[in-house]
Regions:
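Asparagine/serine/threonine-enriched low-complexity, disordered tracts
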Residues: 18-19, 23-27, 31-35
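N-terminal targeting/docking segments
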Residues: 16-18, 29, 421, 425-426
Length: 426
């Protein structure tokens, strides 16, 4: 990050291929494109770049969750460039919503998924647990189920992991983790992930020896404060599977929740277990060439019913964060077809939302400020309008808002009024 310059999320493409792109030949893979949108604009990842002073990166939480600022972007229903920006405090959120509206939270819990250790050769390693899996779910042809010295391997405790090391560990190699309190063997690879077989149940050992995987831009190790503040106040302890927090929810405390309830604003929950891919940069020049990471998600029927009833009553559904957005819009594509009502759904989602996407469920989005060139910045640009997001980010920088996971929040209106409707498959 460099010293502040005017935010411009609409920079000219510098890549020759992008400049000369024949847009008539581009295949749009998004299943939900707004027929009124210029769907082939803003395809260059450089369109989502901006400059941010390092001093505005929030590396520690405020003393009180709801003490953060809230930028309300009241988007015009006609042009996304005619938007009103209102500075509020997060504790005033209820004032911006109406009785009968529905807020949807993500109830996942963050694992202490970061571990440190060494290979049996002595080389240091850092392990980040991405997902716990059953060995039966893996491709057996890529697995080596014995150590380099021919010993059998415990196949009950398997995880997909990121491993940092000066030299990548080999198949069958033993890893000593947490000063020897945890042992694992490399039994395979799945794309950029290592498949590790642990000697003992993984989750209890993570709680004892693991470190909370706070974002890399914090530039520090997790401390005792993070163990509380990098979790939401309403997480489900049984849903311990994320490697990053649903950060928009970190602002909520009892004060805010009580105000929402007192006003008659309803709440519901979905689950999305956040993977490390949420921090992964987009490495392609053209966003249509980006491969989106996949995460497990679940929309329960009780929440689907509340959403359907809320819309039937003419009220709004407010997604708390991009993770909730991805769950609800995926479930809409999967279940709300041919005029059917939204219904329960569970599975992996790799939905990629960028300008031109036609939202089927959410009416407002509460979110934090996102990293340059990130898929999350593309998502909010799709929702509120790219020009409006550009204005809001410049306003936030000029007024010293705090950015990223421990930063301030923004409440976004949808760019156009689109009611939940039948999926039009491309």
């Amino acid at each position: 990050m460099t010293d502040s310059q005017p935010v411009n999320l609409d920079t000219t493409c510098t890549d020759t291929a992008d400049k000369n792109l024949d847009k008539s030949n581009v295949k749009i893979t998004n299943k939900m494109l707004d027929k009124n949108a210029e769907t082939l604009e803003y395809l260059s990842v450089d369109d989502y770049d901006y400059e941010l002073p390092d001093s505005l990166i929030a590396r520690y939480p405020l003393a009180q969750r709801s003490a953060s600022k809230l930028l309300y972007l009241a988007t015009s229903q006609q042009k996304d460039s005619d938007s009103q920006i209102i500075d509020k405090q997060f504790s005033e959120l209820a004032d911006l919503l109406n009785a009968g509206d529905l807020i949807v939270f993500n109830d996942t819990k963050v694992m202490k998924a970061r571990l440190f250790g060494q290979k049996d050769t002595g080389g240091k390693i850092e392990v980040l647990i991405e997902r716990l899996v059953n060995i039966s779910d893996l491709d057996s042809t890529v697995l080596q189920l014995e150590t380099t010295d021919g010993k059998s391997i415990n196949q009950e405790h398997i995880a997909l992991c990121h491993v940092k090391a000066s030299k990548a560990p080999k198949l069958g190699q033993r890893l000593e983790i947490a000063d020897g309190h945890m042992q694992a063997v490399v039994i395979g690879r799945q794309e950029n992930l290592f498949i590790l077989a642990f000697e003992a149940p993984i989750l209890p050992d993570l709680e004892r020896y693991g470190e909370l995987p706070i974002p890399p831009y914090f530039e520090r190790h997790a401390d005792a404060t993070d163990n509380t503040r990098y979790q939401t106040v309403f997480h489900d302890p049984a849903k311990l599977a994320s490697v990053a927090a649903p950060t928009a929810s970190l602002h909520f405390d009892k004060l805010v929740l009580d105000k929402l309830a007192a006003k008659g604003i309803n709440t519901a929950f979905v689950t999305l277990h956040v993977g490390a891919g949420t921090f992964a940069p987009v490495k392609t020049d053209n966003l249509l060439n980006h491969t989106m990471h996949s995460e497990y998600a679940h929309l329960p029927q009780v929440t689907a019913d509340l959403i359907n009833q809320t819309h039937a009553n003419g009220k709004q559904v407010i997604a708390i964060g991009t993770t909730v957005t991805r769950v609800l819009e995926t479930a809409y594509q999967k279940t709300a077809v041919n005029g059917k009502a939204l219904s329960s759904w569970a599975g992996d989602t790799d939905i990629f939302i960028y300008p031109g996407f036609r939202f089927g469920v959410i009416d407002k989005l509460l979110t934090n400020f996102h990293l340059p060139k990130s898929t999350l910045l593309m998502l909010v640009s799709a929702f509120a309008g790219k020009a409006a997001i550009e204005q809001a980010y410049q306003h936030a920088i000029d007024n010293h808002y705090r950015f990223f996971s421990y930063g301030d929040a923004m409440l976004l209106d949808k760019k156009t009024k689109v009611q939940a409707q039948t999926l039009n498959k491309q």
